[in-house]
A protein has these predicted regions:
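Short catalytic/metal-binding and nucleic-acid-binding patches
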Residues: 1-132
Length: 132
Protein backbone atom coordinates (compact mmCIF):
# COMPACT_ATOMS: atom_id res chain seq x y z
CA UNK A 1 0.00 0.00 0.00
CA UNK A 2 1.29 3.44 -0.88
CA UNK A 3 2.15 5.91 1.80
CA UNK A 4 0.29 9.24 1.97
CA UNK A 5 2.38 12.20 0.85
CA UNK A 6 1.89 15.65 2.27
CA UNK A 7 2.43 18.47 -0.20
CA UNK A 8 2.23 21.21 2.41
CA UNK A 9 4.46 21.38 5.49
CA UNK A 10 1.65 22.95 7.53
CA UNK A 11 -0.56 19.82 7.41
CA UNK A 12 -1.51 20.09 11.09
CA UNK A 13 -2.27 23.81 10.93
CA UNK A 14 -5.71 25.00 11.98
CA UNK A 15 -5.55 28.15 9.88
CA UNK A 16 -4.01 27.10 6.54
CA UNK A 17 -5.36 24.75 3.89
CA UNK A 18 -3.77 21.39 3.14
CA UNK A 19 -3.09 20.33 -0.45
CA UNK A 20 -3.41 16.72 -1.59
CA UNK A 21 -2.55 14.96 -4.84
CA UNK A 22 -5.20 12.31 -5.45
CA UNK A 23 -5.22 9.55 -8.03
CA UNK A 24 -8.05 7.15 -8.73
CA UNK A 25 -8.29 4.46 -11.37
CA UNK A 26 -11.16 2.74 -13.14
CA UNK A 27 -11.82 -0.87 -12.10
CA UNK A 28 -9.95 -3.41 -14.25
CA UNK A 29 -8.15 -0.49 -15.92
CA UNK A 30 -10.97 -0.28 -18.45
CA UNK A 31 -11.19 2.80 -20.64
CA UNK A 32 -14.46 3.99 -19.12
CA UNK A 33 -14.28 7.75 -19.64
CA UNK A 34 -15.49 8.81 -23.04
CA UNK A 35 -16.48 12.38 -23.87
CA UNK A 36 -19.90 12.17 -22.15
CA UNK A 37 -18.56 10.36 -19.09
CA UNK A 38 -15.82 12.96 -18.68
CA UNK A 39 -18.38 15.75 -18.76
CA UNK A 40 -20.52 13.91 -16.20
CA UNK A 41 -17.45 13.44 -13.97
CA UNK A 42 -16.65 17.17 -14.21
CA UNK A 43 -20.22 18.04 -13.23
CA UNK A 44 -20.10 15.76 -10.16
CA UNK A 45 -16.62 16.97 -9.25
CA UNK A 46 -17.83 20.59 -9.18
CA UNK A 47 -20.97 19.65 -7.22
CA UNK A 48 -18.90 17.92 -4.54
CA UNK A 49 -16.42 20.77 -4.58
CA UNK A 50 -19.29 23.09 -3.59
CA UNK A 51 -20.57 20.62 -1.00
CA UNK A 52 -17.25 19.93 0.69
CA UNK A 53 -15.82 23.43 0.68
CA UNK A 54 -12.67 21.98 -0.89
CA UNK A 55 -11.21 23.47 -4.05
CA UNK A 56 -9.94 21.54 -7.05
CA UNK A 57 -6.79 23.44 -7.99
CA UNK A 58 -6.05 21.28 -11.00
CA UNK A 59 -7.15 18.00 -12.49
CA UNK A 60 -6.30 15.66 -15.32
CA UNK A 61 -9.11 13.37 -16.44
CA UNK A 62 -7.99 10.53 -18.69
CA UNK A 63 -9.78 7.51 -20.14
CA UNK A 64 -9.02 5.20 -17.22
CA UNK A 65 -7.82 7.37 -14.33
CA UNK A 66 -7.99 10.81 -12.75
CA UNK A 67 -5.47 13.07 -11.00
CA UNK A 68 -6.69 15.86 -8.70
CA UNK A 69 -4.78 18.55 -6.85
CA UNK A 70 -7.14 19.32 -3.99
CA UNK A 71 -7.02 22.14 -1.48
CA UNK A 72 -8.77 21.27 1.79
CA UNK A 73 -9.49 24.32 3.93
CA UNK A 74 -9.25 24.15 7.71
CA UNK A 75 -12.55 23.59 9.48
CA UNK A 76 -14.11 26.86 10.55
CA UNK A 77 -13.85 27.69 14.24
CA UNK A 78 -17.01 26.28 15.78
CA UNK A 79 -17.87 24.40 12.58
CA UNK A 80 -20.41 25.42 9.97
CA UNK A 81 -23.52 27.39 10.79
CA UNK A 82 -26.85 25.66 10.18
CA UNK A 83 -27.41 27.90 7.14
CA UNK A 84 -23.98 27.07 5.68
CA UNK A 85 -24.60 23.34 6.16
CA UNK A 86 -27.99 23.52 4.44
CA UNK A 87 -26.49 25.54 1.56
CA UNK A 88 -23.85 22.84 1.05
CA UNK A 89 -26.44 20.08 1.20
CA UNK A 90 -28.46 21.85 -1.51
CA UNK A 91 -25.39 21.62 -3.77
CA UNK A 92 -25.73 17.83 -4.03
CA UNK A 93 -29.18 16.83 -2.77
CA UNK A 94 -32.66 17.66 -4.07
CA UNK A 95 -34.87 19.93 -1.98
CA UNK A 96 -36.92 16.92 -0.80
CA UNK A 97 -33.82 15.56 0.96
CA UNK A 98 -32.68 18.87 2.46
CA UNK A 99 -36.04 19.94 3.92
CA UNK A 100 -36.13 17.12 6.54
CA UNK A 101 -32.58 18.00 7.65
CA UNK A 102 -33.58 21.66 7.99
CA UNK A 103 -36.63 20.62 10.01
CA UNK A 104 -34.55 18.36 12.24
CA UNK A 105 -32.04 21.17 12.85
CA UNK A 106 -34.85 23.62 13.67
CA UNK A 107 -36.35 21.13 16.14
CA UNK A 108 -32.95 20.57 17.77
CA UNK A 109 -32.38 24.33 18.06
CA UNK A 110 -35.84 24.73 19.62
CA UNK A 111 -35.11 22.00 22.19
CA UNK A 112 -31.83 23.72 23.02
CA UNK A 113 -33.60 27.09 23.40
CA UNK A 114 -36.26 25.49 25.64
CA UNK A 115 -33.58 23.92 27.83
CA UNK A 116 -34.61 20.40 26.84
CA UNK A 117 -31.37 19.54 25.09
CA UNK A 118 -27.75 20.49 24.65
CA UNK A 119 -25.74 21.74 21.69
CA UNK A 120 -24.80 18.09 21.13
CA UNK A 121 -28.20 17.57 19.41
CA UNK A 122 -27.30 19.98 16.60
CA UNK A 123 -23.67 18.86 16.55
CA UNK A 124 -24.71 15.25 15.86
CA UNK A 125 -26.82 16.37 12.88
CA UNK A 126 -23.91 18.41 11.51
CA UNK A 127 -21.43 15.56 11.98
CA UNK A 128 -23.48 13.26 9.74
CA UNK A 129 -22.45 15.48 6.83
CA UNK A 130 -19.22 17.18 7.89
CA UNK A 131 -17.21 14.49 9.66
CA UNK A 132 -13.55 14.57 8.57
Amino acid sequence: MRKARWLAPWKDSFDRPVIYHLVTRVVDRKFAFGKEEKEQFRMYMRMYENFSGCRVLSYCLMCNHVHLLLEVPPMQEGGLSDEALLKRLRAIYPKACVVPVAKELAEARQKIADGLGTEQLATEIHERYTYR
